[in-house]
Amino acid sequence: MFDPIGKSGDAFALAKDYALEAKNWGADLSLKAYVDERVAAEDLKVGKCDGAIISGLRGRQFNKYTGSLDAVGALTNMKTAINAYKLLSSPMAAKNMVVGPYEIAGLGTIGPAYLFVNDRSINTLAKAAGKKIGVFKYDEAQPKLVQHVGGQAVSVDVTNAGAKFNNHEIDIVPAPIVAFKPFELYKGLGEKGAIVRFPLTQISADFIIRKDQFPAGFGQKSRTWVASQLNRTFGIIAKYESDIPSKYWMDIPKNEQLNYMKMMREARIQLTKAGIYDPKMMNFLKKVRCKENPSNFECALNDE
């Protein structure tokens, strides 16, 4: 499983609890921590592992439907994310969890993705124009988003994103708050930088298994248990956020938040048309958002 901190991380601790539960479902799991999720995904593909816990961005190659959960702006708050994950973990959604030999056996969370900027004057989308923005090369959506705001996309991966930000090779990097300490992002923030307190999305954690290597019914039992742990994992993430010194956080004005939402919505629609995001998932997530907040401007529109 992927944990940037390795065996001592909170994600690996959760995986150990998961392995204990899995014995009740007829599976004896042996855990291995990966600090590079690309290697974890490759080991799953070639059969070195029977399962892997990786981010939804990396998991999109195994299941486009669940891999579209992380679509930009689709889930920007914890309550909506928990509702969506729990609905998708119910038996009614089981048919969408299997693609070829792979089954999504759980939908967890790595937490919200925030923009880390090296200068807090970058407080509007317009001011991101011309800036060097780190994009994860395996996610086709990110370069298109950067193009949308007029920035320069710079390819990064989990192993070097922090170093590139800290060495000022990039001005902006999107990252979950759990990356703050292990990737030493405070170095890149310095005295002038900030974390924009406006989540771009929630980064999901996909529990992916080779279905034929597990007992019948394992996938649903697993999804139900993972969903039952969502409040726990979001609590861990909230603690990470509260531990960040207040000087690093930057709030953006309400009118600028609306600009962000509109830009991300336009980008989602374009990326869905381009075949990157799954249209069924986009429709489902819109329904979840509008049930939560029926007065939102998007709820009167029907193009997503």
Curated annotation (Swiss-Prot):
Gene3D superfamilies: Bacterial extracellular solute-binding protein, family 7. Keywords: Antibiotic resistance, Transport. It comes from the Bacteria. Transmembrane segments: none annotated. The keyword Transcription regulation does not apply. One of its GO terms (biological process) is response to antibiotic. Pfam families: AdeT1_2. Disruption phenotype: Deletion of the gene results in increased susceptibility to different antibiotics, dyes, detergents and disinfectants. Mediates antimicrobial resistance via active efflux. Contributes to resistance to antibiotics such as chloramphenicol, erythromycin and novobiocin. May be part of a tripartite ATP-independent periplasmic (TRAP) transport system. Belongs to the bacterial solute-binding protein 7 family. This is Probable solute-binding protein AdeT1. It comes from Acinetobacter baumannii. The lineage of its organism: Bacteria, Pseudomonadati, Pseudomonadota, Gammaproteobacteria, Moraxellales. The gene is adeT1.
